[in-house]
Amino acid sequence: MIPALTPEERQKLRSAILHRMQLELETTEKLIENIKEETLKKLNLLQQPDATSAPQSKELIREVLEQEGRRIE
C-alpha cells in the first residue's frame, strides 16, 4: 500500500508543479511573441511591392499562412 503524503509533502509537490507550469507558460508566451514578430515582419515586407519579387511574395505569403495555421491549432 502507498503511504499518504503529509500536508507538507503535498504543498511541496504543488509548489514544484506550479513552478514548472509557470515556466512552461512563460516559454509558450515567448514563442507566441516571436511568431507574432516574425509574422509582422513578413507582412511588412509584403506591403512593400518594390522590395520583393513575385516568387518571394508568394513564399512569404505561404510562410505567414502556415504560421497562422499552426497558431490556430
Curated annotation (Swiss-Prot):
| The organism's place on the tree of life at top rank | Eukaryota
Q: Which UniProt keywords apply?
A: Cytoplasm, Cytoskeleton, Nucleus
Q: Which GO terms describe its biological process?
A: attachment of meiotic spindle microtubules to kinetochore; chromosome segregation; positive regulation of mitotic cell cycle spindle assembly checkpoint; sister chromatid biorientation
MF (Gene Ontology)? protein-macromolecule adaptor activity
This entry carries the following GO cellular component terms, namely: chromosome passenger complex; cytoplasm; nucleus; spindle
State where the protein is found.
Nucleus; Cytoplasm, Cytoskeleton, Spindle
Task performed by this protein: Component of the aurora kinase complex, also called chromosomal passenger complex (CPC), essential for chromosome segregation and metaphase chromosome alignment. Mediates the SLI15-BIR1 interaction within the CPC.
Q: Which family does it belong to?
A: Belongs to the borealin family.
Q: How does it assemble?
A: Component of the aurora kinase complex composed of at least BIR1, BNL1, IPL1 and SLI15.
Q: What is this protein called?
A: N-terminal-borealin-like protein
* Organism name: Saccharomyces cerevisiae (strain ATCC 204508 / S288c)
Supply the source organism's classification: Eukaryota, Fungi, Dikarya, Ascomycota, Saccharomycotina
